[in-house]
Amino acid sequence: MAAGSRIDLTNQFLIAMPGMADDTFAGTVVYLCEHSERGALGLVINKPIDIKLKNLFEKVELSLDRAELAEQPVFFGGPVQTERGFVLHEKQGEGESPYTSTMSVPGGLEMTTSKDVLEAMSSGAGPRRVLVTLGCSGWSAGQLEDEIGRNGWLTVGADPTVIFDTPVPQRYQRAVSLLGFDPRMLSNEAGHA
């Protein structure tokens, strides 16, 4: 890569290598919502916590009558802003009201941090396919690139079916398989030719 050039990893999965030194991210798949010269922001998609969506809605004094969502787990999105909710969802349809605080991610997903998305879901509207996290993952300028350079992460284009349709215990393996090889072939040893 030429000096001064950079790769945009927005709408990519970060897949933790088996030798990941940081226990917080060991075994994780992170969906990158934003990656720029200022840093990166993502959500861990395969670490559920012991809270169901219906319980989270109760905590914010909303009801959730959508059976397909009520028992869905809330996820640990990362160690940053752990008291804040992040809702990863498919892009809103035509004619739907926009939410107060939504980031559009190239590739068709959106991340919303305002309570109005929960209110829409509570009323039976809102996004149909969601992943809700408490906290997010953040990297300062150059930090993620450094971790990738030290063989901490693999990257691959994100596939929404891994986020929304793949059972949680299979998400890591499924994300690795997007690279075209068996996850059992990963080693925690890195080499350079």
Q: Can you say where each PLM-predicted feature lies in the sequence?
A:
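A short aromatic-anchored loop/beta-hairpin motif
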Residues: 1-133, 137-193
